[in-house]
């Protein structure tokens, strides 16, 4: 397998500048300063929310073009519809398997740690006003409605909305049509291929504004919710963070090792994106950059285009851990006994509802509301217990989801024999000489079957 030169591919990052010129350093500084400001001057911190919101809106502005161009050019280059179906099928098998593991891990940890034991909360005494909005939104989450929502009203409507799956749907169909057009479709493919250059250049421009967005978002979070809210529910928050860490290092670490790469090196490779996700509490904020870096790490372009956007809806490992752990925490805190049958129902409902909340703001909390509504044994009023700390768990959910999707892309690429190991090693090792060798000709993975 040898990388082929590509003069018009996305411009690579140049991570070998001094550390104080690198993006991740300034994101760290922004997070620290934002946290200090939010803690010392809560009112001022809350006023900075527009900074984080504006940055996320800017990133979402570019997500649709990035997904569309990556998928269409990737599929049209493959020119085999069967290959697209095979990649999608393998991705869904992976997503289902690891989503199941994440849900089971949350259940196991809740039984071992018992984070809600001894709280003796009476659900009647809980204030339910603040969770009413989440409960109302959860009523709209149905599997049929979710599937129907993937189909857009018009060909252009996905590009003016915020439903990633609709963009994915249109891009796959257009890419297949372009592949079937053969030589007559080449001019269109070349045009779309050329458009990737300014689009990914725009992504790099927007990423330079990440410290500003992270500063505003973290200042708002600390200013509004405060670190004190973590004390009372520290058992739940700590259990969730440790469980997520266990999932990433042990489960994802094991599958990474089996596929020939290190999870720790992958995390180091994606450190700037992970810090951005931490600061903004949104894994979507780093989606364009993740797609670019996965291609640079040797993954097939068509695989990246299919797996990453789909994973943002179907491969939510952090959200799955949160669902079962939080549900059992509420049951323990309210002294609600759950039989094995109840827990099995909880598990199955969580598996389905986590897919139906894809792309919804506050998806983790809304999905939990939908799950508890179907499993009435766990009092839905108990959600009021965790509302105050849910924002702090949101960061961990987003980070785990993000790492899970990066690993999924590499695993499916290897499974599909579309992973350039030489290019992956160069990217993850991060040596300057190797980097310069890799990008001497703006290389992009090209794998012969």
UniProtKB/Swiss-Prot annotation:
Localization: Cell inner membrane
PROSITE patterns documented for this protein: NA_DICARBOXYL_SYMP_1 (PS00713), NA_DICARBOXYL_SYMP_2 (PS00714)
Protein origin, superkingdom: Bacteria
Entry's Gene Ontology cellular component terms: plasma membrane
Family, per entry: Belongs to the dicarboxylate/amino acid:cation symporter (DAACS) (TC 2.A.23) family.
Keyword line: Cell inner membrane, Cell membrane, Membrane, Symport, Transmembrane, Transmembrane helix, Transport
InterPro entries in the record: C4_dicarb_transport, Na-dicarboxylate_symporter, Na-dicarboxylate_symporter_CS, Na:dicarbo_symporter_sf
Function: Responsible for the transport of dicarboxylates such as succinate, fumarate, and malate from the periplasm across the membrane.
Gene3D superfamilies xrefs: Sodium:dicarboxylate symporter (1.10.3860.10)
Transmembrane segments: 20-42, 62-84, 91-113, 164-181, 202-224, 239-261, 344-366, 370-389
GO biological process, one term: L-aspartate transmembrane transport
Pfam families: SDF
Protein name per the record: C4-dicarboxylate transport protein
NCBIfam families assigned to the protein according to its UniProt record, in alphabetical order: PRK01663.1 (NF002461)
Species for this entry: Xylella fastidiosa (strain Temecula1 / ATCC 700964)
GO molecular function, a single term: succinate transmembrane transporter activity
SUPFAM superfamilies: Proton glutamate symport protein (SSF118215)
